[in-house]
Amino acid sequence: MQLTTTPGIDGKRITRYCGVVAGEAVLGANIFKDLFAGIRDLVGGRSGTYEKELQRARDIALEELQQRAHDLGANAVVGIDIDYEVLGKENGMLMVSASGTAVIVE
């Protein structure tokens, strides 16, 4: 299945719009990961732990989006938008949502 942030796919023609699809992932941050990420933030540098969690959440959201598109009979999703939010008490959770339009392309 093709996934793209653009409204179409070069060289392909959209023959049917199947509907809007979305996928979400909400992940809690581990207290020890938070502690070490906080130390890294104090001394400078990137937090590899948070980067991995962001990537994991994005992958889950896109997999859900793809499965929902497949369930509608689509073979592509166009116009994908990915949003990131922090949730929960003291921003202890990360939510990634992905949405787009499921289509059939030829």
Curated annotation (Swiss-Prot):
Disulfide bonds: none
SUPFAM superfamilies named among the record's database cross-references: YbjQ-like (SSF117782)
Domain of life: Bacteria
Annotated signal sequence range: none
Annotated transmembrane regions: none
UniProt cross-references to Pfam families, sorted A to Z: YbjQ_1
HAMAP family according to UniProt: UPF0145
Protein family per UniProt: Belongs to the UPF0145 family.
Protein name: UPF0145 protein Nmul_A0734
Species of origin: Nitrosospira multiformis (strain ATCC 25196 / NCIMB 11849 / C 71)
